[in-house]
Amino acid sequence: MDLSERGTTTARHPWEVVRAEFFRDLIARSADLGRVHDVVDVGAGDGWFAQELVPLLRDDAQVTCWDINYSADDLVADLPAGVLRTATRPSTRADLVTLLDVIEHVPDDRSFLRDEVGPLLADDARLIVSVPAHPSLYSQHDAALHHERRYTRRQFLDRLRESFTVLDSGSLFTSLLAPRAIEVAAERAGRSSGERGVGGWHGGPAVT
């Protein structure tokens, strides 16, 4: 969860749960987890996804949660074994780096990928990246989350290929496009503020 979305509830939004399951499965298929020792989760937020990764990894693996918005309290919080937090770029070269819904927050995504993310990668490392899609769905919800943009598939892949070799690509969560489109339409009609994030969710498993 993005730190800006943290609320009073500890329940996870269904979208977060499905997203975590998707990326856990993707990582299990894409990386040789028996050889993964160092993991960096860039823009890790509250670190829930990073903690969900731990059971997949070898016992001596270390997951570093990197988020520039960590407070002093965040940095001294109790964390599970093998999980660390930092507000500055880690010096380690990781075997696996996750960058999930992060680069849309960065004004200069090109330089960020090249100069900040690139140096984190060890030889033969895997980088898993996701972004919000469909620029036409950019809304007040995106603005409230400090998103600079949404991406077309081509824009996203072109940006990645400037700095990395893209081994695989795909799309996901298309089932959320219709609800998002309805929300954007309501927002433009003045019937929705679009500002509620996953941290303010209090529904059941069938309510998003």
Where would I find each of the regions flagged by the language model?
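Conserved N-terminal segment of class I S-adenosyl-L-methionine
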Residues: 1-96, 100, 110-115, 197-200, ...
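Short, glycine-/aromatic-enriched active-site segment of Class I SAM-dependent methyltransferases
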Residues: 7, 127-149, 153-159
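A generic alpha-to-beta junction signature in SAM-dependent methyltransferases
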Residues: 57, 121-123, 160
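Short catalytic micro-motifs in class I SAM-dependent methyltransferases
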Residues: 101-105
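A short glycine-rich, Lys/Arg-flanked "PGG" loop and its adjoining helix->strand segment in the class I
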Residues: 111-126
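Conserved S-adenosyl-L-methionine
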Residues: 164-174
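C-terminal helical/coil "lid" or tail adjacent to the Rossmann-like core of SAM-dependent
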Residues: 179-208
